[in-house]
């Protein structure tokens, strides 16, 4: 049945969901998915049940990969797809529900520390890279052989950084090569104990050097992309990189480069705008965007403490993957804060399709903590773990008697003066003897009550005792699209 207000019932069966899947030729499965290394990982652990996690675009190969691994290892494989949150995070909950003893993650990964001690290995992929073209592009953008530059890449191009560095090292002696911060095998020691770990990567810095001194050359961004928004991995790097240092991206297929300085400036400007929106907000929705990343419960408690200290009301919402339709059910919220891994938190920005802006935890920290940022710290963090106690970037809330809470604050959006937190008493104890007793006109100020009073429809009227009592009668039968008492059209 089809009408002006509904689609035909057959449309739900004919609709193609998700993105087109990838089908790799059988002879290339071993190379693309590194099955030899995965087999060695499973056999060394002696696992009998293994979970294989695939993103949507790789589910077409999931069956063939699982069958090949079962044949070689003799272990039982479980395919994990359609994760409740971002596919870049390991689905440790799904693996534990399947009784898996280990997990293999295929595809792009944020490499955030998991909340479980389950053995995990990552297969990031091996995207082809034109080394000669990328080397020429690097030399064109860095004519000074003494320049401090670090080589970065998207996860699928990480395998090409060492060969690229081999071509460049005869000329560039101070070249720094990053590597994915993959978990080390159980019982092994890192060969680079002094390496700095940041942005999901390891940087083997020389003594006396800091990452803030280096420019960046990123292999992986493509100028042929039709999406005007930056991918989350590159956005994460641009936000956290030192302002003023050169940052170039290079397409691994063509070797074409692009200066990302202007895009980094737009990202930081958008972050400042979101901070202002968070400062103006009275009701904040905390969206749970991960259950598999370490310290997510501590981060949730930290965000609730922040909003309470700033005099804001917060609500925790566990909705799975956020969509405009889901969040539209909560019009009381002024802003939403997505508690997720760095890539998941940046995936929804810019949040043009949502009726309220979606922030990252770092933006809420900058809005609610008057002591943020401390001198010498750039406020462009991307991971919520960097805000928690124990992190070198943690900034505790100032005490209630601190003058930071009394600093005049004017909204850059509305131009109005923001009031201090409600718990901050404005009464002067020296003049309390002359203060008249209040008449209790306002018992309590509630953002929810203010929002309800401003709505044109406030719900059904109870009208207790005013409605006549009637006997129950049989109602309509059927579904909303076609009740039984309606004729077919």
Swiss-Prot record:
Q: Which residues carry this modification: Phosphoserine?
A: 7, 446, 456, 488
Cofactor dependence is on: [4Fe-4S] cluster
Location of Phosphothreonine modifications: 435, 467
- List of residues binding [4Fe-4S] cluster: 89, 110, 341
Say if the entry is tagged with keyword Cytoplasm: no
- Name one cellular component (GO) term: 2-(3-amino-3-carboxypropyl)histidine synthase complex
Cofactor binding, note field: Binds 1 [4Fe-4S] cluster per subunit. The cluster facilitates the reduction of the catalytic iron-sulfur cluster in the DPH1 subunit.
Reading the lineage from the top rank, the first entry is Eukaryota
Q: Is Disulfide bond one of the keywords?
A: no
Query: In what pathway does it function?
Result: Protein modification; peptidyl-diphthamide biosynthesis
Keywords, in A-Z order: Acetylation, Iron, Iron-sulfur, Metal-binding, Phosphoprotein
- Biological process GO annotation list? protein histidyl modification to diphthamide
The entry lists its GO molecular-function terms as: 2-(3-amino-3-carboxypropyl)histidine synthase activity; 4 iron, 4 sulfur cluster binding; metal ion binding
- Which positions bear N-acetylmethionine? 1
Q: Which InterPro entries match?
A: DHP2 (IPR010014), DPH1/DPH2 (IPR016435), DPH1/DPH2_1 (IPR042263), DPH1/DPH2_3 (IPR042265)
- Describe the function of this protein: Required for the first step of diphthamide biosynthesis, a post-translational modification of histidine which occurs in elongation factor 2. DPH1 and DPH2 transfer a 3-amino-3-carboxypropyl (ACP) group from S-adenosyl-L-methionine (SAM) to a histidine residue, the reaction is assisted by a reduction system comprising DPH3 and a NADH-dependent reductase. Facilitates the reduction of the catalytic iron-sulfur cluster found in the DPH1 subunit.
What family is reported?
Answer: Belongs to the DPH1/DPH2 family. DPH2 subfamily.
Give the record's subunit note.
Component of the 2-(3-amino-3-carboxypropyl)histidine synthase complex composed of DPH1, DPH2, DPH3 and a NADH-dependent reductase. Interacts with DPH1.
Quote the protein name from its UniProt record.
Answer: 2-(3-amino-3-carboxypropyl)histidine synthase subunit 2
Q: Which organism is it from?
A: Rattus norvegicus
